[in-house]
């Protein structure tokens, strides 16, 4: 996995990258101090790439499939807050922070394999469902990832009594299992002792459900319209309060009605962001 930066890599970013697992980084530039830090990662084998910040891709993209070449214009759509002016729901309040999150969601979707749905919270992408044949499958997949992100912030998880000699990747893997339905895999005698100083109490299904119910203020973007209200039902369970989607379904009324049921503010952008 590579880290892609849109600005010059500074010392703070390089210090953060040094402790995170990745195969390389690409950026338009690096400060001398940042480059010196990155050179020490992976014993000097960390891949550091610099891209020309003035590079502009071709306006026409092409793809060859079994000898047939397909061409189309590159997606140059500008994602701005102007896309959020058409709000057909009863709740029309989309504050500035939510508009920022919706923009992040749509920008993410612009470069994500369709069909795709993206959840964003506090300026961070917390769940992406991509490459699915069904829109609701995208919403479920991204919602499940958003739930995992939130569960990792549960006090029981934050206070897991890890041994000092357990490395960060192993801690991360243990947390992933601990918050899943397979939590017993890290808690039996003979296994928990390798990870923890004392045996943790499990995070029960009821506790997880109650914790997820506390998640609010999530923004969701979709790369095309929602055909049914079931997408909204699933999104609501992961704390979604703001939605941006293209609109244009013959069942838009049902989708709007479901948003109103949960007081969700939804903008219809009129913009499809399909990417194949």
Place the predicted regions along the sequence by residue.
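ATP-dependent carboxylate/acyl-activation modules
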Residues: 1-242, 249-276
């Amino acid at each position: 996995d590579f880290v892609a930066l849109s600005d010059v890599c500074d010392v703070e970013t390089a210090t953060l990258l040094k402790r995170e697992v990745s195969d390389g980084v690409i950026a338009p530039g690096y400060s001398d101090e940042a480059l010196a830090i990155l050179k020490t990662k992976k014993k000097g084998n960390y891949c550091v790439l610099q891209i020309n910040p003035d590079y502009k891709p071709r306006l026409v993209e092409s793809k060859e499939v079994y000898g047939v070449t397909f061409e189309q214009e590159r997606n140059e759509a500008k994602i701005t807050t102007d896309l959020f002016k058409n709000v057909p729901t009863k709740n029309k309040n989309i504050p500035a922070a939510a508009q920022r999150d919706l923009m992040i969601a749509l920008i993410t979707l612009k470069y994500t394999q369709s069909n795709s749905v993206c959840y964003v919270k506090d300026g961070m992408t917390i769940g992406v469902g991509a490459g699915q044949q069904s829109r609701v499958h995208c919403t479920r997949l991204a919602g499940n990832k958003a739930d995992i992100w939130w569960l990792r912030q549960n006090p029981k998880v934050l206070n897991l009594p890890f041994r000092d000699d357990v490395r960060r990747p192993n801690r991360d893997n243990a947390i992933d299992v601990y918050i899943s339905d397979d939590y017993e895999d890290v808690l039996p005698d003979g296994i928990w002792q390798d990870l923890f100083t004392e045996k943790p109490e499990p995070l029960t299904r009821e506790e997880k459900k109650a914790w997820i119910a506390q998640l609010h203020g999530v923004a969701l973007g979709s790369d095309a319209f929602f055909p049914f209200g079931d997408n909204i039902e699933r999104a609501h369970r992961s704390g979604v309060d703001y939605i941006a989607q293209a609109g244009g379904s013959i069942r838009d009324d049902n989708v709007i009605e479901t948003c109103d049921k949960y007081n969700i503010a939804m903008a219809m952008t009129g913009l499809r962001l399909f990417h194949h």
